[in-house]
Amino acid sequence: MYKTKAVFNLKLKQKFVFIFILFVFLSLQGYSQRGGFKWSSDGNSYYRIENNSVMQYTLPENSAKVLISKEQLTPKNSSSPLDVRYLISSNDEQKVLIFTNTKRVWRLNTKGDYWVLDIAKGSLTQLGTSLPESSLMFAKFSPDGKAVAYVSDNNIYVEDLNTSDIKALTSDGSTTLINGTFDWAYEEEFACRDGFRWSPDSKSIAYWQIDASDIGKFYLINNTDAIYSEVVPIEYPKVGETPSACKVGVVSIADAKTTWMNIPGDSRQHYLVRMEYI
């Protein structure tokens, strides 16, 4: 009886651990969505967005405190706080990137507006104000915390956080030449969305460029956004057709010059789905 009970308790504990790990995995996969959470850099606490504020829960007691209040998330000349989709902290956790006013791209809301909250100064500043509304994608702090890079309309930009100066690192982006993100095929088949990486020294950015100019178009009908339908063309390679060309380059923050990597193989027949600094 006791042996059976012990085995049952062990299996129950194992099941609990499995469920907890699965919960953590799914939460981390989707922490960008409201209701998820994000671990602190030291692993001793985690953050959640609750009631328009950011809460910090410290382990093991799971004690809670307001890390960022809704007043801190309220822009000047506004009576309501930002509708936060997700948060990204700088390496020193003194600044926070806030993603809001989002729009769907294919399956996920990856376009939107980004704001930077400087916790020490208490300042809340919108990024990319000279670019179209809700057009910024995949904003990331530089490792030194002095700048933020993001994609808008298939070009990559870097914004100095001290001066708010915005520099275009690429300028050839179009609906078929895609810098810093991916086309439908890469997202659908490989879950590739975020298409650039900061270098550890904050002096350059490595990025993907997708050339879909020779891909045949698949036409969709948009019947929902207006009283008249609209034809929406999508570059969509059918089975047996040649897919998009892909290459990886490294662009200098100082002069915006790109050095293309010499990668063996056919750029249209060989997929490049992962790339990181090591």
Predicted region positions:
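N-terminal secretory signal peptides that target proteins for export/translocation
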Residues: 1-14
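Bacterial N-terminal signal peptides
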Residues: 17-27
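Beta-propeller folds
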Residues: 30-278
